[in-house]
């Protein structure tokens, strides 16, 4: 399951909370959970996350100059006035819950280096699941908008390599 912006927020909230046992993997794009909607998956699942470093709608980090700073519960206040959980804090919380290796390794793709594209892999998660986070210099959109279609092939390759298996419950 994949979703962009609000669709990615759906994945980070309701899909993780209620559908994790039915999904092999998820691929949220340019999204982060809203404050108060960041449940942990009830069963482990693989995640590939794409986020533009220049996203001013749902910020990747609180350091973007157009953000309004940090909000309650260590959220970032975006220029739209919403409070979003900081992306890497949320992923770290999920990875800790799924007992992933704390250190990341490079996750090579055919886009590496293009516009700063880099992907990091955390493996060793419960049930053999993995978490990948990819980012580059683009905004609130699918990676590189419609100039490149490689983002979807990276997502699809990840999902094909993480089929549904019996998952240990928590």
Stretches with model-predicted labels:
Residues 1-46, 56:
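Primarily recognizes the serine-hydrolase "nucleophile elbow" in alpha/beta-hydrolase
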Residues 38, 59-61, 106, 167:
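Short linear functional motifs in flexible/disordered or boundary regions
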Residues 40, 60, 145-149:
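Conserved strand-to-helix beginnings and helix N-cap segments that scaffold or border functional pockets
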């Amino acid at each position: 399951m994949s979703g962009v912006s609000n669709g990615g927020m759906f994945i980070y909230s309701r899909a993780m909370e209620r559908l994790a046992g039915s999904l092999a993997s998820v691929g949220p794009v340019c999204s982060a959970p809203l404050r108060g909607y960041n449940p942990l998956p009830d069963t482990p699942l693989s995640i590939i996350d794409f986020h533009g470093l220049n996203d001013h709608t749902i910020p990747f980090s609180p350091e973007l100059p157009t953000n309004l700073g940090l909000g309650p519960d260590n959220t970032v206040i975006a220029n739209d006035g919403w409070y979003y959980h900081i992306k890497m804090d949320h992923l770290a919380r999920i990875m800790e819950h799924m007992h992933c290796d704390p250190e990341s390794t490079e996750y090579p793709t055919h886009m590496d280096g293009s516009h700063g594209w880099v992907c990091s892999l955390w493996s060793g998660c419960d049930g053999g699941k993995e978490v990948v986070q990819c980012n580059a210099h683009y905004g609130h959109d699918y990676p590189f908008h419609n100039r490149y279609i490689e983002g979807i092939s990276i997502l699809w390759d990840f999902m094909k390599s993480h089929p549904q298996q019996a998952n240990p419950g928590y």
